[in-house]
A protein has these predicted regions:
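Conserved catalytic-core segment of nucleotide-activated headgroup transferases in glycan assembly
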Residues: 25-35, 42, 185-251
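A donor-sugar binding/catalytic signature common to diverse glycosyltransferases
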Residues: 112, 263-307
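Nucleotide-sugar donor-binding patch of glycosyltransferase catalytic domains
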Residues: 123, 129-138, 177, 244, ...
Length: 391
């Protein structure tokens, strides 16, 4: 009766865990996985451990990607596309982990090869950023995405552009681990010009979730500024996915009654159709700049142009290549470890066994016949406290 030979390390399909988050982060991870058809994939919403997980369960983190609202959107996307889900990577046994953020690095992936993928634009580097960088005891998430890359708990960090590589190195990220690949969703902004969004030639406002994440945001002043820029043209607001949509609609209706408001939809396609883009702190500014729109932003536009993600149309493919490199290194290490284990377990020839045994016994014999070993043991006073000295 024939038996199937067990799969070797080279034949076994690698297992890859993809840690998602916001819809932008989730779609990025999906695109990367599609470029790794030789691997078995599993996805999970963003997660933490210890007190972070306790706070999440208590619904104290609803303003973050850990919250139930954004977690549900992530899971809805994964279910809609029929993607395998392993919540919190509980199944284990992964050969590689991709994550959209290193502000929290779960304990159960810290011994695995990790690839960190930049999501988009960073939060401004204010006082919390400088405190977190100086005081290592502070958690990175206190400063928001400004501290991205500073955990050091990854093997490779895939970033959007050479400008961002320089920025992350200046912030303190290890230069030797950073790879410029471009980032999915922002590597081909021209594709968004092919859309069926019904409006054209308007002023688009991409608002932020600043208030939901406990940052200052004078919304009344901001809407007044938008009206001034629009100067009578059609004004359309695209709300941030994490924003309190009901409150935002109420404010816009009171201050800009002629404006249209969208809580859902593709912001990038709306940007492609607009004449003017107004943003606060948002990655959508990259799309506006890449498409040559008139842009008004809280971000320094000269800095945005320096940091603009590479328009290489191949970010997911480039990141997949980085993953393959790490998987190959991991496979080689496992093969070397197996070879060493097999060599150490192999039986020695009989004549060599006898010689090695005789040599070991001859070397060990003096320890058992020395007079100091045969003399009675006297304990010092220190033995009263559990410590025994031989004299």
């Amino acid at each position: 009766m024939s038996q199937t030979a067990p799969a070797t390390a080279s034949q076994r399909r690698p297992k890859v865990l993809l840690i998602c988050g916001s819809l932008n982060q989730t779609t990025q991870m999906h695109q990367i996985a599609q470029e790794l058809p030789e691997a078995d994939h599993a996805y999970t919403p963003y997660y933490g451990h210890g007190y972070i997980e306790a706070l999440r369960r208590a619904r104290c983190l609803e303003f973050t990607v850990l919250g139930y609202k954004l977690r549900r959107r992530c899971l809805d996307y994964l279910e809609r596309h029929g993607l395998p889900v392993d919540p919190h990577g509980a199944a284990g046994g992964y050969d590689l982990v991709l994550t959209c953020s290193d502000l929290i690095v779960p304990r159960n992936i810290r011994r695995r090869p990790v690839v960190l993928v930049q999501e988009g634009i960073l939060d401004p580097a204010g006082l919390p950023f400088h405190l977190c960088r100086s005081l290592k005891v502070l958690p990175l998430w206190l400063a928001g995405t400004a501290t991205t890359g500073l955990s050091g708990r990854y093997h490779r960090f895939c970033v959007a552009s050479e400008g961002y590589r320089d920025l992350f190195i200046a912030n303190g990220a290890p230069a030797e681990r950073i790879v410029v690949t471009g980032i999915p969703n922002f590597d081909d902004c021209r594709k968004y010009e092919r859309n069926d969004f019904p409006h054209r030639h308007f002023v688009l406002v991409c608002s932020s979730d600043a208030r939901e994440t406990f940052k200052l945001d004078n919304r009344r002043k901001f809407i007044a500024r938008c009206l001034a820029v629009a100067a009578g043209r059609q004004l359309i607001f695209k709300l941030h996915p994490n924003e309190n949509a009901e409150r935002a609609r109420r404010e816009i209706a009171a201050l800009a009654p002629g404006a249209l408001v969208y809580a859902t939809g593709c912001a990038e396609e709306m940007i492609a159709n607009c004449d003017v883009l107004i943003t606060q702190y948002s990655s959508t500014v990259f799309v506006g700049v890449a498409l040559g729109k008139e842009v008004h932003s809280y971000n320094d536009l000269a800095e945005v142009r320096r940091l603009l993600p590479q328009q290489n149309r191949s970010a997911a493919r480039n990141i997949a290549a980085v993953c393959r490199e790490l998987l190959q290194v991991e496979e080689s290490a496992l093969a070397a470890a197996s070879a060493v284990s097999a060599a150490s377990a192999a039986p020695l020839p009989a004549t060599r066994v006898a010689r090695v045994g005789r040599e070991r016994w001859t070397a060990a014999l003096p320890r058992f016949v020395t007079p100091s070993r045969l003399a009675p043991t006297r304990r010092s006073k220190a033995s009263l406290f559990g410590r025994t000295r031989l004299r």
